[in-house]
Amino acid sequence: MTTERPADLMEKIISLAKRRGFVYPSSEIYGGFAAVYDFGPYGVELAKNIRDAWWKAMVYDHDNIVGLDSAIFMHPKVWEASGHVGGFSDPLAECKECHARVRVDHLLEAVGVFADEKMSETEINALFSEHKDKVKCPKCGKSNFTEAKNFNLLVQSNLGNFTGDWTLGPTYLRGETCQGIYVNFKNVLDSSRVKVPFGIAQIGKAFRNEITARQFIFRKREFEQMEMQYFVHPSEAATTYEEWREKRFNYYVETLGLRKENLRWHEHENLVFYAKAAWDIEYNFPFGFKELEGIHNRSDYDLTQHSKFSDTDLSYLDPKTNEKYIPWIVETSVGLDRTFLAVLTDAYTEEKVGEEDTRIVLKFPKKLAPVQVAVFPLLKNKPELVEKAREVYNTLRQDFRVEFDDNGNVGKRYRRQDEIGTPYCVTIDFDTLGENPGLEGTVTVRDRDSMQQERVKIEELGTYLKA
């Protein structure tokens, strides 16, 4: 059974994300910019914690996976070799009534018809024509469209084109990060001590000229990928693939704390010609189950293509057997933004407090929370309380992500920290200073999830908060 979600959950998450500084529409003072978003002060911390968790799980927890940070701009032939120049496209149609441009596969999906991503332009148009009376424009509601045309998603740039002479052809902002890994395969092999099987991990920005911008940060034109390409002997690819499937599913439950019932597997029935297997881990977003991470057995296609187009030998010579071969690749690929949205969705909770009040709380795992501890003086107009609170704050910030807050009454401060997802709030009051001799040197610690409060000695605070 999946967790029941209110119909307006997406709207509530978007509102909270802006109100509490997680996500802002980009360039909002100019009216915004479709499918482009900025992380605010708490969003950037949550995103960093997600990156760090992924990097630890993929790189630091393995002795045969190394990191890479490849450039966003690459030689134009990289994208020819990868197939992006000729085949990286979505089917586009224009509404003849309001001139809105929309993805045909999304229009069909809205009426329960699913178009295979490998369909030719002719095939997608035949399917589109078959269901044209049911398909409605999302903007004006009419059913009057042009034929579908394939629209390339690569974002073209004028980089280096000072004279208008495109000697190398147009340059692009990268459409995916993995190509930077493939073209550096030989460099990593030659400069480090890795041997097959080994992996290369990378986190970085990618860009796609998406036709339809929707579903908040789930589908963006500028987004961040976290990918690992694992190079193996062809005979070990199938076994390795299953091992990584298990590891990656467990990661979301055990490391990120997502509820297992909100995750499921989806197998690709129709594979691209070079792929041997492709499964997605799907998460139950407010708009339904959608892809969170893809795990793919890509065979030797990528290294073979780049070897051919670059005229560079990208084969591997096994030092033990002297066998020479092109390694196969097992890929794990996830979007940071989608992970961010999944973590935010899973954490979002509304709870009744008393008979009439409702509190909103983000129940992040402690290690992901943007702020781990908030420190309050009971009153901001009492210098002795503020001074002691600052002292506690400065001590705790050596080991925790800490925020100091003295605005408003303590109850309102609690609610604000609940909406930020802060696991603990520490309040310095007059008992801390010795008004009650039996409580001198103690503080009140309030737990986010239970709302229970406990007195803890200042010298024991660090140990208590780490428990």
Task: Describe every region a protein language model picked out.
Residues 1-467:
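NTP/phosphate- and nucleic-acid-binding module
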